[in-house]
Amino acid sequence: MRFVLSFIFLIASSLSFAAHKIPEFTGPDFTGVYQCNGLDMHEGEYKGKVTLKLKKEHSQAQYGSYDFLLEVPGYGKYPGHMAANGLIAAMHFALENQSTHDFGTGISQFSKNAKGQWQFHKFYFEPKFKGGNSGFEDCVKQ
């Protein structure tokens, strides 16, 4: 009798697990290269390039997971990652040269411009760069 009950429990557990299928990604895909104009509260105005790549295997429903890379001439590369919920996304980034503590987190709002291109406006905070720092970026997909 115990064997039968254990077997029934095992089958029921397996069916329950199968019912929890991860939903397919249905959110917007922001993959691409973006040209950016930024304003850093310590460094001033700058131009950069952001590359986003969807990680579909880690995305589901309206939630998107991305590789993130910001490149700023004269400063370097800031690899990181981005998590999106619909048109709102959070990013973490860190300068490859970690000696300056130039890393932070940003929050962005995505939209399409009049030409139908994805664009985003980002606010970022860097807790350790030069005693703390913040700034803005406006980026348009090329």
What are the functions of these language-model segments?
Residues 1-4:
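Positively charged n-region of N-terminal signal peptides that target proteins for export
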Residues 13-16:
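N-terminal signal peptide c-region/cleavage motif recognized by signal peptidases
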Residues 19-142:
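Central antiparallel beta-sheet cores of small beta-barrel/beta-sandwich binding domains
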